[in-house]
Amino acid sequence: MIKNLHVTHFPLAPWQVVEPDRTLRLVLRVASGMIQRVECLNCDPCDTELDASGAMLPRLEAIEVPLTYNDSEFEYYVLKKRMETHKLRYHFVLYSLEGTFVLDERGVTQSAEERLIRPFFVSFVFDDAPQPAPAWAKDMIWYQIFPDRFRRGAGKANWNSDPITDRNAYFGGDLKGIRDAIPYLKKLGVTGVYLNPIFAAGSVHRYDTIDYRAIDPGLGTEEDFVRLCDALHENGMRIMLDGVFNHGSWKSLEFQDVAERSVASPYLDWFKMTDPDAVKSFVSGGYVGRSPYNTFAFAPDMPKWNTQNPAVAEHLMEAAEYWTKRCAVDAWRLDVPDEIHPSFLREFHARMKQLNPNLYIIGEIWSDPTRWMSEGLFDGVMNYPVYFAIRDFFLLRSIDAVQFCDRLTRYFALTPESWQEGMFQFCSTHDIPRILWYAKGNRKSVLNCYQMSSLFPGGISVYYGDEQLLSGGFDPDNRRCMPWNRVGREPFAAELFEQIHLLRRGRVKSISPINDDSIEIRLQDGQLPVCMSR
């Protein structure tokens, strides 16, 4: 019987989380239909009393744990309890038709004697626990712009939205063009603009930053950027920048100095060099063979920064502080932060929040974000787990409704509410094929995906052109030019944003399959359920 319970709980995130308001969230997962009731017996470990025999016993409080979520295999019992002191001990009592069981650090047993109990513990809760995302972030409708492909300033030639095969092609989009498009964005109901990198770089994507204190001349000047930020703020929109602090460019002053002077360079420790003497010949020789330094994704033109070096950290953070203050930047999205040392992320978060406590910081994390969220390194992350579930069900059709609902139920059960509020939802980005490409041109599928994504807590982002049914496969084709010739003639844009605004008012409470291709979504606050079919 014990084996059949398939009980899961760990005294660590995401199964045990103390939220910013000091609410303890405990999650217990058991096999469906095996348990009738669950109690959590808990108290401060120092809260004790003597019994009649003189034995020291804890003053345990029994709290019934509600069944909160269930999928096709498991039931999730979620307890929310205010932490009245700084520590807690607890164990679970599971009631079934077969008997009563105890879950503690020993596992599942039928031994409930206090002298044998090995309770779980909530470690000391410090007053500087991670804070929630800024309140404004959860209501945002972002619009992501790849600057070179969005819009050219007045006086420049037209372009088209043909498929792109040349990864290095420049089309001339700039900051003035983005500013000229603000009336278009405002009409759609966009409340924030997320810009891919804009600093001086050696490529069209600009993820190979040469100078973090300079705007790329292909996009404009610093004054152009200041005017863009001012115009966005004047129109009630926020601005989010892409912070590429994991790696830089081989053209940067610091890297070129290492290439020229090898071990004599003062910047030697700014990078992770395996053979400093070979750098110059490797770069000048056309990158033949194995790189003598660490890079991002085996790309020799993007050497990795040594973010454990205090001088490197200061160099990068000073630049972020400069732009945050200069242009009242509202948010930062950090590129590949899973490769950046946590000490850098921790200091970045602290310094940015010191500048502006309402600044929003997200990370590009493609997998389970528990490690970063539990440490308070980000306010949220790009919500790839939810994106992949939506893509697999509605677009690839690689899973049925049961599997889709199971994945999303696990997400809700194992993602604390304070984390959910800071998430960044999306259906397309510069890193993945566009949603219309996956949908094979089916606009209903595009609408379904954005509708589904809109129901999740956190902000939602529309990748430029999705609303105009712009297609595009894998990089670089997902970065086609914005089809301005369709604006005003394509009714889908208004329909898409109308649905996003409408569904942002709801929040998913539970999701269940109707049949292989259809789902029912129950919303919080007693709103009518939503049914969707792919």
Question: How would you name each of these model-derived features?
Answer:
Residues F245-H247, H315-P342, Q425-H430:
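Active-site groove signature of glycoside hydrolases
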Residues I141-Y143, V193-L195, I239-L241, W332, ...:
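Hydrophobic faces of well-ordered beta-strands that scaffold small-molecule active sites
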Residues A137, G153-F171, A181, D406-T409, ...:
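Loop/helix patches that line or flank the sugar-binding groove of alpha-linked glycan CAZymes
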Residues L28, I145, L185, L195, ...:
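Conserved, mostly hydrophobic/aromatic
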Residues C229-R238, H247-S262, K325, D335-S418, ...:
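Active-site-proximal helices and loops of the catalytic beta/alpha 8
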Residues M1-K138, T191, L355:
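Glycan-association/targeting regions that enable binding to alpha-glucans and other polysaccharides
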Residues M140, F146-T191, I198-E321, R326, ...:
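Substrate-binding/active-site clefts of carbohydrate-active enzymes
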